[in-house]
Swiss-Prot record:
Naturally occurring in which organism (per UniProt): Canis lupus familiaris
Protein family per UniProt: Belongs to the nicastrin family.
GO process terms (BP): multi-pass transmembrane protein insertion into ER membrane; regulation of signal transduction
Function: Component of the multi-pass translocon (MPT) complex that mediates insertion of multi-pass membrane proteins into the lipid bilayer of membranes. The MPT complex takes over after the SEC61 complex: following membrane insertion of the first few transmembrane segments of proteins by the SEC61 complex, the MPT complex occludes the lateral gate of the SEC61 complex to promote insertion of subsequent transmembrane regions. May antagonize Nodal signaling and subsequent organization of axial structures during mesodermal patterning, via its interaction with NOMO.
Sequence ranges on the Cytoplasmic membrane side: 544-563
Signal peptide residues on this chain, from the entry's feature table: 1-42
Cross-referenced Pfam families: Peptidase_M28 (PF04389)
Keyword Transmembrane helix: yes
Name under which the protein is recorded: BOS complex subunit NCLN
Entry-listed glycosylation sites: 241, 428
Length: 563
């Protein structure tokens, strides 16, 4: 029998029986010679940044989940349930985002361009308006952001093509495509997020003491340094509020020089405060006020505060608005400062549209509108200077607020305008007859645009979300060192949330590594098992009935020879 089988196999390999031999040996040949997928196509590893997750005043915000292990789809797919939905920023809309959540998507990954400055302005504005809505909607769906690269773009395009083909095919084609198509399994390397205990929010203060007695009036200059956006690791906050901190540091430099000489040493104390937690209802300012007004007997804030000037988003545009909770009364120093701002803007910077915006404090709101409201609640005269007319403007809390959005010349001009108005108030120049069109800061005392640019570059070179600014990190140590060059009694203030009733809670797992593995669908294993079973069944049947197979082959050979 074995000799006969050998004869049959030998005959099958002859030219006349090549098709039959090809069929018999084809599966083995394919298994041996099929090239493996290149490593780059089989798997890709990239960094992802998770959406905000925090609690504020007991209210949860953002995504509540961090674990992801599901197959990728684009928003074009018919079925998104338990799938990782890939979206590009250029094609993103809030309606599509809601669609993914409504269909119980397993996760959402939004792919951002590498060069954010090249993104069209209408796309940036639309996404800025969308970010607060995304955060306001608490969800258990993990939401991640990734920066585009060639491999990730290829994954997106392949997934999009598969989703589009599946949507336009017939039912049979969809079934076949479902069973045989390649897909990508998206898997994160991290674990489930958990609350970060005892996280410290740090603020930095310094002062310039006025010349004269102990009961001198105090002018407080405030700006929060932290940034905010839909993803903490992508929050660089160039305009909000890198511009405010840059102006504060430049004012500290300018007035430290004026206070160095007795002839220009004014009879005002200047208190500079770089606050932390500004994007979380001004937690640093709130606790700083409590410590200075409730828990100490010697503080510049307790007696004779002339006014508090808060700086927020002053790095672009040709408008400046002085936001107040209560219009200043005539005869007060804050009213004099308002008039000086108007005069300097009109005579030295006519292109600037200056106005005062009056908005009462809404204590029913969980989050205050502007930082000056923290001071106004404690009955300290305060206002906020900003180029934004409304506190609801999306520019204040967006990952799109990058360095390119701050215009260096505009920032320098606004710094000079603020410095000129402050100087005219402090030295009472208007009453002394100095015309409003005569600049004070000239020659060696000029505003240094290079200095402002270097500070802006330093601030925007790192994410400054409150969850990421460590008390021992380089950001705070550099900020403290910078202020120490010009101010006296520079020190840090640390606060942490109450353990029993925390006002704020931060969570970890905000930055992870995601892997995209090329995989076949689960049904492909079933289809492959059926095919292998059928092939083995045919082979088994052929062996069991070899005599019949042998006779059939012989007849075919004889017939072929006679022809």
């Amino acid at each position: 029998m074995l000799e006969e089988a050998g004869e049959v196999l030998e005959n099958m390999l002859k030219a006349s029986c090549l098709p039959l031999g090809f069929i018999v040996f084809l599966p083995a040949v394919l298994l041996l010679v099929a090239p493996p997928l290149p490593a780059a196509d089989a798997a890709h590893e990239f960094t992802v940044y998770r959406m905000q997750q925090y609690d504020l005043q007991g209210q949860p915000y953002g995504t509540r989940n961090a674990v992801l292990n599901t197959e990728a789809r684009t928003i074009d797919a018919d079925v998104l349930s338990r799938r990782c939905v890939l979206m590009r920023l250029l094609d993103f809309s809030y309606e599509q985002y809601q669609k993914a959540l409504r269909q119980s998507a397993g996760a959402v990954v939004i792919i951002l361009p590498r060069a954010m400055a090249a993104v069209p302005q209408d796309v940036i504005r639309q996404f800025m308006e969308t970010e607060p809505e995304m955060l306001a909607m608490e969800t258990v769906v993990p939401v991640y952001f990734a920066v585009e690269d060639e491999a990730l773009l290829s994954i997106y395009e392949q997934t999009q093509a598969a989703s589009a083909a599946q949507g336009s095919a017939s039912a049979a084609e969809v079934l076949l495509h479902t069973a045989t198509a390649n897909g990508f399994q998206m898997v994160t390397s991290g674990v489930q997020s958990k609350a970060v205990s005892d996280w410290l929010i740090t603020s930095v203060e310094g002062r310039l003491t006025g010349l004269g007695g102990e009961d001198l009036p105090t002018i407080v200059i405030v700006a929060h340094y932290d940034a905010f956006g839909v993803a903490p690791w992508l929050s660089h906050g160039a305009d909000s509020n890198g511009s405010g901190i840059s102006v504060l540091l430049e004012l500290a430099r300018l007035f430290s020089r004026l206070y160095t000489y007795k002839r220009t040493h004014a009879a005002y104390n200047l208190l500079f405060f770089a606050s932390g937690g500004g994007k979380f209802n001004y937690q640093g300012t709130k606790r700083w006020l409590e410590d200075n007004l409730d828990h100490t007997d010697s503080s510049l804030l307790q007696d004779n505060v002339a006014f508090v000037l808060c700086l927020d988003t002053v790095g672009r545009g040709d408008s400046l608005h002085l936001h107040v909770s209560k219009p200043p009364r005539e005869g007060t120093l804050q009213h004099a400062f308002l008039r000086e701002l108007e005069a300097v803007a009109a005579h030295q910077f006519p292109e600037v549209r200056f106005s005062m915006v009056h908005k009462k404090i809404n204590l029913a709101e969980d989050i205050l509108a502007w930082e000056h409201e923290r001071f106004a609640i404690r009955r300290l005269p305060a206002f906020t200077l900003s180029h934004l007319e409304s506190h609801r403007d999306g520019q204040r809390s967006s990952i799109m607020d990058v360095r390119s959005r701050v215009d260096s010349k505009t920032l320098t001009r606004n710094t000079r305008l603020i410095a000129e108005a402050l100087t005219r108030v402090i030295y009472n120049l208007t009453e002394k007859g100095t015309p409003p069109d005569m600049p004070v800061f000239t020659e060696q005392m000029q505003i240094q645009q290079e200095q402002l640019d270097s500070v802006m570059d330093w601030l925007t070179n790192q994410p400054r979300a409150a969850q990421l600014v460590d008390k021992d990190g380089t950001l705070l140590s550099t900020l403290e060192h910078y202020l120490s060059r010009y101010l006296k009694e520079v020190k840090q203030h640390h606060i942490k949330a109450d353990k029993r009733d925390p006002e704020f809670v931060f969570y970890d797992q905000l930055k992870q590594v995601m892997n995209a593995y090329r995989v076949k669908p689960a049904i492909f294993d079933l289809l492959l098992a059926v095919c292998i079973g059928a092939y083995l069944g045919m082979a088994y049947t052929a062996v069991q009935h070899f005599d019949l197979l042998y006779k059939t082959v012989q007849r075919l050979l004889v017939k072929a020879k006679t022809q």
